[in-house]
Amino acid sequence: MVVLAYQYFKKQKPQGITVPVDSLVVIIGLIAFSVIPLLVNGTRDFSVITMYVKELILFIFGVGLYNAFYANVNGQQKVVRDLQLGVVVQFAVGVIGLLGASFMIDFLLSTNAVLPARFYGSEQEYRLYNITATAFFQLSLFYLMLLHFLLAYNAKHNTLPSILVFLMLCIGLISGRTFLLLSVVSILVYFKWRYVPSLIAFAVLVLLLAYFLPENPYVAHALEPVINLLHGEGFVSSSTDT
């Protein structure tokens, strides 16, 4: 934001500052609508409002970053490059967290919105091993849109490494089952034969986890449908409905 302010006052931004007003209005609207359940139910659970406020703050910083560093001729290429870097970083920290490194788990949980205590230490905690202020369903949709964007970009430019598909599927799986189910649509729409090794690697990983570690609480929740297919119907996690 400081860099952007400097560029603006030095008149290095003759085209002005781009602000996606529609997206800004949507986030503010979500904050406003989140107040209604509090008023109706008389509760003091501000976790949802806190999440959207964090999103608003991050969105504003994101707009600032875009205008400061990406609003130029090569901006699109730079955005895609940094998104790829972000995917690699998220994959790395997510795996470290899943392996049980306490320092990484503490760091990842600190980046999330504050959620009800029942989620911490539960079979769903793995879904919080993401560097984000968003939780669960919204996070799955975010990763879904990110996958769709990167695949669409690659369909046109064909410059992204195929391993990126594997990494995206892995971090998307951490976010929840919504991503796992809906990502199939994006992959089918923008399918390339060179994605096949990454897709096979991911499928093998999922099958191995579901077959050999069905009792692991994180695996049981994330891969419940696959476990049911492999081990027979009737196996359910304690949080199937969520």
Where do the protein language model's features map onto the residues?
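Aromatic-anchored transmembrane helix interface
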Residues: 23-34, 44-68, 82, 87
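Transmembrane signal-anchor hairpin modules in multi-pass inner-membrane enzymes, especially those
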Residues: 1-36, 74-81, 153-157
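Juxtamembrane membrane-water interface segments that cap and precede transmembrane helices
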Residues: 114-131, 241-242
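Hydrophobic alpha-helical membrane-interfacial segments at the cytosolic entry of transmembrane helices
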Residues: 25-29, 82-92, 194-216
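Membrane-interface loop/short-helix elements at transmembrane-helix boundaries
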Residues: 124, 221-242
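Transmembrane helix-loop junctions and nearby membrane-interface residues
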Residues: 5-12, 35-42, 95-105
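Alpha-helical transmembrane segments of multi-pass inner-membrane proteins
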Residues: 80-108, 129-175, 180-192
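Hydrophobic cores of alpha-helical transmembrane segments in multi-pass inner/ER membrane proteins
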Residues: 2-4, 57-67, 140-150
